[in-house]
């Protein structure tokens, strides 16, 4: 059975840990959400192929900037996450996360993931953003950023409602099993 290492990165509080907990337990976490979810390994079937999917959470806070790259070696696919209701986290994909991932792993496939999809149409959330002269990130904006960073796919999901959640991980597996021909064949990430 093929083993796939999937590492999840993005700003603090964009919902990386909730994404992983919701996917692996089929339940949105209650009050307590840890900073970092323990590494998790699951046997899953995608396109009738059995795969051992290893999920690695990371802490997005700056305090972890030196430690985080230690989880990057041998990564098969990255999920770079931003919150659809946090324009700052969207900008940081370009400013921080894409450069960091590419520095350590020049050819590992990336899936860009917009989280908190359930809040994009939430009146209170929209109102709070409006007060700061901001708005939620739209699907076309997400697609444009995905193209800019040469992401394999752009997907949106909600860990709360689970809408689009399984697709994120299925597509992460497909990005490894069915690599796009334009990418270099050597994908494993190594620490230099």
Curated annotation (Swiss-Prot):
**Modified how:** (Microbial infection) Glycosylated at Tyr-32 by Photorhabdus asymbiotica toxin PAU_02230. Mono-O-GlcNAcylation by PAU_02230 inhibits downstream signaling by an impaired interaction with diverse regulator and effector proteins of Rac and leads to actin disassembly.
- Modified positions (N6-acetyllysine) in chain numbering: 147
The UniProt record gives the binding positions of GTP as 10-17, 57-61, 115-118
Entry's transmembrane regions: none
Where are the glycosylation sites?
A: 32
Describe what happens upon changing residue 62 to K. Answer: In IMD73B; gain-of-function variant; exhibits impaired GAP-mediated GTP hydrolysis, resulting in sustained GTP association and prolonged RAC2-driven activation of downstream effectors; when transfected into cells, shows increased basal reactive oxygen species production following stimulation by PMA compared to cells transfected with wild-type; increased interaction with PAK1, compared to wild-type
Q: InterPro entries recorded for this chain? A: P-loop_NTPase, Small_GTP-bd, Small_GTPase, Small_GTPase_Rho
Q: Which residues carry this modification: Cysteine methyl ester?
A: 189
Residues excised as propeptide: 190-192
Positions where lipid (S-geranylgeranyl cysteine) attaches = 189
Where is it chiefly localized? Answer: cytoplasm
Q: Where is this motif: Effector region?
A: 32-40
Q: In which tissues is it expressed?
A: Hematopoietic specific.
Q: A Pfam family in this protein? A: Ras
Relay the activity regulation note.
Regulated by guanine nucleotide exchange factors (GEFs) which promote the exchange of bound GDP for free GTP, GTPase activating proteins (GAPs) which increase the GTP hydrolysis activity, and GDP dissociation inhibitors which inhibit the dissociation of the nucleotide from the GTPase.
Tell me the superkingdom of the source.
Eukaryota
The UniProt keyword set, sorted, is: Acetylation, ADP-ribosylation, Cytoplasm, Disease variant, Glycoprotein, GTP-binding, Hydrolase, Lipoprotein, Methylation, Nucleotide-binding, Prenylation
Q: Might you give the EC number(s) for this enzyme? A: 3.6.5.2
- Disease (UniProt): Immunodeficiency 73A with defective neutrophil chemotaxis and leukocytosis: An autosomal dominant immunologic disorder characterized by onset of recurrent infections in early infancy, leukocytosis, neutrophilia, invasive infections, and poor wound healing. Immunodeficiency 73B with defective neutrophil chemotaxis and lymphopenia: An autosomal dominant immunologic disorder characterized by respiratory infections, cellulitis, severe invasive infections, B- and T-cell lymphopenia, and impaired neutrophil chemotaxis. Disease onset is in infancy or early childhood.
What does the similarity note say? Belongs to the small GTPase superfamily. Rho family.
- How does this chain assemble? Interacts with DOCK2, which may activate it. Interacts with S100A8 and calprotectin (S100A8/9). Found in a complex with SH3RF1, MAP3K7/TAK1, MAP2K7/MKK7, MAPK8IP1/JIP1, MAPK8/JNK1 and MAPK9/JNK2. Interacts with PAK1. Component of the phagocyte NADPH oxidase complex composed of an obligatory core heterodimer formed by the membrane proteins CYBA and CYBB and the cytosolic regulatory subunits NCF1/p47-phox, NCF2/p67-phox, NCF4/p40-phox and the small GTPase RAC1 or RAC2.
Report the protein name in the record: Ras-related C3 botulinum toxin substrate 2
What is the organism of origin for this protein?
Homo sapiens
